[in-house]
UniProtKB/Swiss-Prot annotation:
K(+) binds at residues 176, 185, 187, 190. Its cofactor is Mg(2+); K(+). HAMAP family: Xni. Binds 2 Mg(2+) per subunit. Only one magnesium ion has a direct interaction with the protein, the other interactions are indirect. Belongs to the Xni family. GO terms for molecular function: 5'-3' exonuclease activity; 5'-flap endonuclease activity; DNA binding; magnesium ion binding; potassium ion binding. This is Flap endonuclease Xni. It comes from Vibrio campbellii (strain ATCC BAA-1116). Keywords: DNA-binding, Endonuclease, Hydrolase, Magnesium, Metal-binding, Nuclease, Potassium. Its EC number is 3.1.-.-. The gene is xni.
Length: 260
């Protein structure tokens, strides 16, 4: 039997649904709305296996903040009513047949990346449901990303139009430009246009840095800020080697569970 694993970036979905609710304390409405959303996802995707991956709301900013102290320093905290409602949300999702994986020390992004690439590398189909373009570096013939809210696929044509580079170059791209929303600085003076020019000529940051053909205006910037570029690339790259502690059989989709 062919496999189709759907991985839901849980808080990415929940926080968007919750922020659109007229009453932020009405978690019951958030549960109902996310439930309808999940029903549509299940209907459209027809998964054989499915899991929702959550960041732990109490954890720190993980290993990335250890090497880049400002990483996500300014991110908005989760609303208190939503924090208190997470257990109820996870229970409601479980009743729909979707189990939850809660990160402990690792960012949810890395857990998603590890599971997705592990399954996709065996030629099985994987769909990540998220608006987070960071996952696009994982794109492969068997791994796709679905932006549910914009009703679009974050695929190679989208990446080409949005960034002008290949999916495999995205970590290098962000190493150069930085990621302002996560307080990742990149290389001062290198914006999207410059990063695209560099990565059109060279495969990655190291190839550009090592080449005598790099144009002088970019040579000066990389000479002065190569360590920042390397560090920011490392932060932008997703880890795909985390010990998950479960196997596919544990997340087979068999339909709704009985309420406990």
């Amino acid at each position: 039997m062919s496999i189709h694993l759907v991985i839901i970036d849980a808080l990415n979905l929940i926080r968007r649904v919750h922020s659109a609710q007229p009453d932020p304390t009405d978690i019951a409405r958030t549960i109902t709305t996310t439930g309808r959303t999940l029903t549509r996802i299940l209907s459209e995707a027809q998964p054989t296996h499915i899991i929702a991956v959550f960041d732990h709301h109490e954890q720190d900013r993980g290993w990335r903040a250890e090497i880049l102290p400002d990483y996500k320093q300014n991110r908005k905290p989760m609303p208190e009513p939503l924090i208190k409602g997470l257990d109820a949300l996870q229970q409601a999702w479980w009743e729909q047949g979707i189990d939850s994986l809660l990160s402990e020390g690792d960012e949810a992004d890395d857990l998603v990346a590890t599971l997705a690439t592990k399954v996709a590398s065996h030629g099985e189909k994987v769909t990540i449901v998220s608006t987070d373009k960071g996952y696009c570096q994982l794109l492969s013939p068997t791994l796709q990303i679905r932006d549910y809210f914009q009703h679009r696929w974050l695929d190679e044509p989208f990446i080409e139009k949005e960034f002008g580079v290949k999916p495999s170059q995205l970590a290098d791209y962000w190493g150069l430009t930085g990621i302002s929303s996560s307080q990742v600085p990149g290389v001062p003076g290198v914006g999207p246009k410059a990063a695209k020019e560099i990565l059109t000529q060279f495969e990655d940051i190291e190839a550009a840095y090592a080449s005598e053909e790099l144009v002088p205006k970019y040579r000066k910037k990389l000479d002065e800020h190569i360590e920042s570029a390397r560090l920011c690339k490392r932060v932008a790259a997703l880890k795909c080697d985390i010990d998950l502690g479960f196997n596919l059989q544990d997340i087979r989709f068999t339909g709704p569970n009985k309420a406990q």
